[in-house]
Amino acid sequence: MNKLYKKIVCFTLGFGLMVALCGCGSNTPKVQSEGMKSVGSLNVEEAAIYTDDSEKEDVIETYSSADGLCVIERYPTYYDVSLDYGKGEPVEVGKAYAQTILEAVPDFADTFEPYLHENIRGAFNGRKINYDALEERIETLINSLPEDYRDEVISFAKTLSQGEANYAEDGHAEDDYAEDCHVEYGHTEYGHAEDGYAEDGRLSYIEALTMQIIPDALRPTACSALSLGGEKTVSGKRITIRNLEWNTGSNNQMTNIHAVTHMKKGENSITTVGILGLLDIITAVNDDGVMIAILDVGSKEELPFVYNDKKCYTFEIRYALEHFDNAKEAGEYLVGESGDFTWCNNLLCTDEKDAFCCENATKEVAATGKARSVLRTTESELMEGLAWDSPDALCIVNSFATKGNQDGFTGAEFNITRFVKYNKWVKEKDKFSIADAKGLVAREVVDQFVVSNVHNSGNVHTVIVDYATGKIHVAFTKGDHADDIPVFWEVGTY
């Protein structure tokens, strides 16, 4: 294959990224490319050919809970899940979801449990794992969830682990249990909690709770997003693109359980793109077109992890999608809650009219004076040395970008490179169609590690929301890594 090498440094110089030294978190941080190497960008040999339409897969098999609260359709590439909160209480939906998963995917535990433990080991970064401390962390965070979410998650975990988690005859958690969500080893009334964290081929109760809050308790990896306003699109309506990069497991097991989940309550609904069994939000859009997706940022201060009096931001996103019909109010809500989150993060937040990035700093990081929470817009002034040349487009990577905020670009070539590439690609084209948007993630060879790509080996899914039609297009990674030219599927409309 002919591989065209384009120097990253050329991109950097061309778009004015400063290399002068600058202290992290100063009032006017300057982006610098300290430590960058002149390496090539390996492009695909031939340009991808896409259309605005995406094919639809055919259903292989359908599974339903006895009460009809959960329906799972198995497609060749993903699972389509419908959860009906209009016909049942959250605790009943949680139970129905777990029961249907056990029927549809009998080896679900064999798939998810090893992945969960890989994330746990990654969170402890080689240190000896204190499982008692981890259990306390999980219990505390689960207890912080709003009551409906907490009951749903507990019911799901109780059913999936096939234990008896101190439930009343009506299926609701007992008040004392719901209040402190306490699990004690050796007490069989708490289901399989006595097994605790053990890689034994089944998901214990505490493991089934932990899987619901991996981003909040253990932390994700990298992502990027781009939202093109009407002035940059052929249709005159917004197009939003989201790349999720995450650990898919040592055997890429998560690529076998992609899921599109429809959370319905009457006329209202949320469509999430994530992993089968998860009730939090990774990437989602509600029926009003409010789209929110998570991107990790973290802190440069090496502060201790705090979980007491904290909130799970992935469930706060779900709350925002359920209660707000526009991106501005949803974004303002999430920025307002961000001091109580467990990690600093960026949140893509768009609707047909607007695009925002919630630059969310925890109160501990904000107290250092190095970061602050702010709702970034296309008009926000960027930190010194960071160039963006398309006024009607918003780009997000794994760093804050607003002037005066924590600088996660300096010394982070991955962030610099992706931001510069997005800037170049958006600038060089007048208006984008959906086909063009798909083509943005099909420009570079994926299976390489010497350069930083927009569409790279860590990609789990790419979601494109077309505000002209309401269609949701998704490319799911299957196997070792994403395809150089991914296939997009239409998974429904919002």
Residue ranges: model-predicted function:
Residues 31-164, 194-222, 321-494:
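C-terminus-biased signal that marks the final domain/tail of proteins
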Residues 208-311, 315-316, 473-474:
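Internal mixed beta-strand/loop scaffold within catalytic domains of large alpha/beta enzymes
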Residues 13, 29, 189, 378-379:
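N-terminal compositionally biased, intrinsically disordered segments and leader/signal-like regions
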Residues 1-12:
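Bacterial N-terminal signal peptides that target proteins for export
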Residues 20-23:
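C-terminal motif of bacterial Sec signal peptides marking the signal peptidase cleavage site
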Residues 167-198:
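Long, intrinsically disordered low-complexity tandem-repeat segments
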Residues 25-27:
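Bacterial signal peptide processing site
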